[in-house]
Curated annotation (Swiss-Prot):
Mg(2+) binds at residue 15. Monomer. ATP binds at residues 11-16, 116. It comes from Bacillus mycoides (strain KBAB4) (Bacillus weihenstephanensis). The gene is aroK. Catalyzes the specific phosphorylation of the 3-hydroxyl group of shikimic acid using ATP as a cosubstrate. This is Shikimate kinase. Binds 1 Mg(2+) ion per subunit. Gene3D superfamilies: P-loop containing nucleotide triphosphate hydrolases. InterPro entries: P-loop_NTPase, Shikimate/glucono_kinase, Shikimate_kinase/TSH1. Substrate binds at residues 33, 57, 78, 134. One of its GO terms (cellular component) is cytosol.
Length: 165
């Protein structure tokens, strides 16, 4: 089976769904953000603070290309889709899943989360503007799942059905 790339805005449920899907499909799951932190030996928020977002995006592009293209679930950072080369790579080498969640719901979830470098100012308008600027890229995915106010079980049932279509 081709790799499954799980995309979506921060807080949409990519990591959670990736872990559950890996158990259901008996496939390994790899989180690009976690792999970048391991390779760079620092937290993403520190990469952003010390090297900037552009450096992080470069690490992200390198990471996605270094991962297997068969039999693995890859959970991505929310901004990986900003680069056309990443979108092209994922489409050519796997099935791309877009987990959508209403940005107002995500903002409420993330209000107290200090690990999100792009949500530190807690500026809801800027957060939603960033989401909207990426939305068309997310929507290039093969499979779209709306996770807003759904349980993990509901999301999984819908996702498994769409993967098997």
């Amino acid at each position: 089976m081709k790799s499954i790339y799980i995309t979506g805005y921060m807080g949409a449920g990519k990591t959670t769904i990736g872990k559950v899907l890996s158990k259901e499909l008996h496939m390994d799951v790899v989180d690009t953000d976690q792999k970048i932190e391991e390779k760079q030996e620092k937290a993403i928020r520190d990469i952003f603070a010390e090297e900037g977002e552009m450096a992080f995006r470069e690490y992200e592009s390198e990471m996605v290309r270094s991962l297997p293209v068969q039999n693995v679930i890859i959970t991505t950072g929310g901004g990986i889709i900003e680069r056309a080369e990443n979108r092209k790579w994922m489409k050519e080498n796997g099935t791309v899943v877009y987990l959508y969640c209403d940005p107002h719901v995500i903002a409420e979830r993330l209000r107290e989360d200090t690990t999100r470098p792009l949500f530190q100012k807690k500026d809801i308008d800027a957060f939603i503007t960033k989401f909207e600027s990426r939305r068309a890229y997310y929507e290039e995915a093969d499979i779209h799942i709306d996770t807003t106010n759904k349980s993990v079980k509901q999301i999984m049932n819908e996702l498994k059905q769409k993967i098997n279509e």
